[in-house]
């Protein structure tokens, strides 16, 4: 059972302590040093898979989330350090711009809406940077159309063929994400709805459609002689 567990960890470069997350009871925002200690504790418990979520200082956020594209940003350097210390750890990193944008949205806003194609260009750069840093699994949570195919292509072209994509295929526009947004310090701007790119909870068929599209864009099948 332990081998199947994934521990989410929230981390910030702007703190030096372990702070409880009021909106997520039992979870904490870690400094880098204390995060490393937490990972060692988890390994001793037999938990080897970690999902990392950065809480980005407001000073590093902008309209386009450009810090997410910096190959030397905090999360990329942290991924490399973790993999150097604990190569047995399986690291999952999130691919979306919401921790990095002042709007708190998952993509780049043009004319008051998230520009899907412009955002895809940013996401593929972000994904490659995280893979190059040592991420074992890339987890796109942005819900842009066509992102899995674009990211898969970018990973292949950059030589990161073994990097796994774990897609957030079905992500609904819901207030239930509030606690998570608090944890990563993402504040949604007024007047812009994530319903532009996340799914309507009333549409019960769209989740299956989105999952099928992700499979078409990023699923790799090996042939068998059997």
Task: Locate the predicted segments by residue.
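Structural preference for beta-strand elements that scaffold enzyme active sites
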Residues: 4-8, 49-51, 90-92, 136-137, ...
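Conserved, mostly hydrophobic/aromatic
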Residues: 9, 35, 94, 130, ...
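Active-site beta-loop-alpha junctions enriched in small/polar residues
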Residues: 12, 55-57, 96-102, 141-143, ...
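Active-site mouth loops of central-metabolism enzymes
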Residues: 18-33, 107-121, 190-208
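Glycine-rich anion/phosphate-binding loops
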Residues: 24-41, 65-78
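Alpha-helix-loop-beta-strand connector modules within alpha/beta enzyme cores
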Residues: 65-93, 148-169
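Conserved anion-binding
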Residues: 100-103, 147, 153-200
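Conserved small/polar residues in nucleotide/adenosyl-binding loops
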Residues: 222-226
